[in-house]
């Protein structure tokens, strides 16, 4: 508030609704011809901490969200992740009728975090508030293990089983400074694309993989360190095996 104290959840409800309403109105007013086909309503709300996913519905620890890395000012105000459903409720109210509403997160293939995201998103989907899950997909090139190919594809299929769509929103596959080879990277890129196409050809639910976004044009223009070499083109813009 004006004195620097945390506001109540009811005050934040009003602020949230006002912001979401005005944001959608501004987009439609300033860009009347834009096809706003999808919108990321809430981003990175589930904790990486297994204790939080096991006991707090996956809500992050409360904190200011700035100096306290990994903590959430939203949880500081609401006490839990109840703000997520409120955000989707307001977004559904004010978004264009044909705009799909998404939840997006990272490390979304970790089993305990995956299950917390699934539970939250299934509840939102069942209430008619959510249309899709965004998988950020910043992953290493290993084929096995908790971040391996099977773990990733299992997570993708679990989200699709909700009945909602999935978009792979920020895909890059890191070599981790030579820990993995270009061939391993290519194999993992191929496996992910193949699994998405296979699902869409023979789906086991109403959900589809509707987009894949590669998170950068080449290795010289990446948010990752130079040794990651995580993209489809190298630093000289030459195509890699992937």
Segments from the language model and where they lie:
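Aromatic- and acid-rich polysaccharide-binding/catalytic face
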Residues: 37, 43, 99-105, 117-146, ...
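Aromatic-rich peripheral "rim/lid" segments of glycoside hydrolase catalytic domains that contact
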Residues: 5-7, 12-15, 26-30, 34, ...
